[in-house]
Amino acid sequence: MINIPTAILCRLGARSSISRSFGTSIVTKSEAKTPIQKFGWEYLLKQRSKNRPIAPHLTVYQPQLTWMLSGFHRISGCVMAGTLLVGGIGFAVLPFDFTAFVDFIRSWNLPCAVTAVFKYIIAFPIIFHTLNGIRFLGFDLAKGVNNVGQIYKSGYLVSGLSAILALAIVFNSCQNKSNKTA
């Protein structure tokens, strides 16, 4: 059987050794111990006085078509995947289905110009992601990756075709809507 004073001393001893180990690992600004820590702290203070960001920021990099298309490809893929996930779960759980949702939107009788904007916002990322995915598959096959001019031409082609095809889909949709009402 352990007596109470021993248990208290053991707990206090353990607690003080733990607090001692945590206390020595934390370096505050006033007690930098090594020359490297002093240099690092002075460097951060100097950067702060010049209103510079601590880490590299996107404003440091020059905008280039290659990384912008790559970023938009990733973003459009994530947004579409999230939309399918949330929409699929939502329509599985909610008491109405997708067709009822579409009929509800159609019951608002919005003008074609308003629906065209929303249709373009939906169509462009889908078309862009598809065409840019085909472009990236070509890069995976090492087609055109050693020619920077070819990379830029294919990027402009994907961007232009995506915009044109999305406009064609939206225009065709508005034409079909006006033909049905006439």
UniProtKB/Swiss-Prot annotation:
The chain crosses the membrane at residues 65-94, 115-139, 148-169. Heme binds at residue 129. The keyword Membrane applies. Its cofactor is heme. GO terms for biological process: defense response to Gram-negative bacterium; determination of adult lifespan; innate immune response; mitochondrial electron transport, succinate to ubiquinone; negative regulation of response to oxidative stress; positive regulation of response to oxidative stress; response to oxidative stress; tricarboxylic acid cycle. The heme is bound between the two transmembrane subunits. Residues 95-114, 170-172 are mitochondrial intermembrane. GO terms for cellular component: mitochondrial inner membrane; mitochondrion; respiratory chain complex II (succinate dehydrogenase). It is a multi-pass membrane protein. SUPFAM superfamilies: Fumarate reductase respiratory complex transmembrane subunits (SSF81343). Pathway: Carbohydrate metabolism; tricarboxylic acid cycle. NCBIfam families: succ_dehyd_cytB. Component of complex II composed of four subunits: a flavoprotein (FP), iron-sulfur protein (IP), and a cytochrome b560 composed of two integral membrane proteins. This is Succinate dehydrogenase cytochrome b560 subunit, mitochondrial. It comes from Caenorhabditis elegans. The gene is mev-1.
